[in-house]
Regions:
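Long, low-complexity N-terminal extensions
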Residues: 1-228
Length: 228
């Protein structure tokens, strides 16, 4: 009969955290940024089909970094949960806070009970009425969740990007300024200029008359915004 060697719980959690951090750090970053008319999610992503940024529901968007298959599973689960809640109660009852809590619980369970944690960090954003109704929730691989204000960066070079955003961010930017600044910040750790074709971006635009506030920015529009 063989026995598994004893590992202290603290060491086990530390090892899982380090494993997840390494996986996430290998991925390209995502920035979430409030601007005058809503919320911008932007990332360096040359793929035209494997999206990091997506719509979840009418006023709610999702962004993920790390292992694509894992944050894609979370995105799909979030859409299903939002659809179910909207159908059962009402579309106005679907809130980003509730989705963030559901993601937090799921990731916490995976982190503590499964052998391998998810190598992901995700953002859930929401717009409502005016600027005071904008929300950004940052959920970590272990289920920790924080309510961010103004801006947030996740993925590789997270600390450098956050520091740069902290130095430069100003509330009330128009979309062009927000896109230009975010693109410059994304390329700053390596001193690179990121071209429009390598940028993925989407906005939650509260000024849209449609019920669905999410809009994906296509390459020609991104190029125009970068030119100012």
């Amino acid at each position: 009969m063989s026995f598994m060697p004893y590992v202290a719980p603290e060491q086990m959690m530390k090892d899982r955290s380090e494993y997840a951090h390494k996986g996430i750090a290998r991925g390209r970053s995502v920035i979430g940024l409030e601007y005058a008319d809503g919320l911008l999610f932007i990332a360096e992503n040359p793929s035209a089909s494997l999206h990091k940024i997506s719509e979840i529901y009418d006023r709610i968007a999702f962004a993920g970094v790390g292992k694509y298959s894992e944050f894609e599973d979370l995105r799909i689960a979030g859409i299903r949960l939002a659809d179910l809640r909207g159908f059962s109660y009402g579309r106005e009852d679907v809130k980003a806070r509730d989705l963030a809590n559901a993601y937090s619980q799921a990731l916490s369970t995976i982190f503590t009970q499964q052998m391998k944690p998810y190598e992901v960090e995700i953002l859930v954003g929401e717009v409502d009425g005016d600027a005071s109704g904008t929300a950004i929730y940052h959920i970590l691989f272990d289920g920790s969740v924080t309510d961010e204000h103004g801006f947030v960066a996740v993925g590789g070079h997270e600390e450098d990007l956050t520091g740069s955003l902290r130095d430069r961010f100003q509330s009330g930017w128009d979309l062009a300024t927000a896109v230009q600044t975010a693109a410059e910040v994304l390329g700053s750790p390596d001193g690179r200029t990121i071209e429009a074709g390598s940028i993925e971006a989407g906005v939650l635009d509260r000024t849209r008359t449609q019920r669905r506030k999410f809009r994906r920015l296509e390459e020609p529009e991104i190029a125009q915004l970068l030119e100012g």
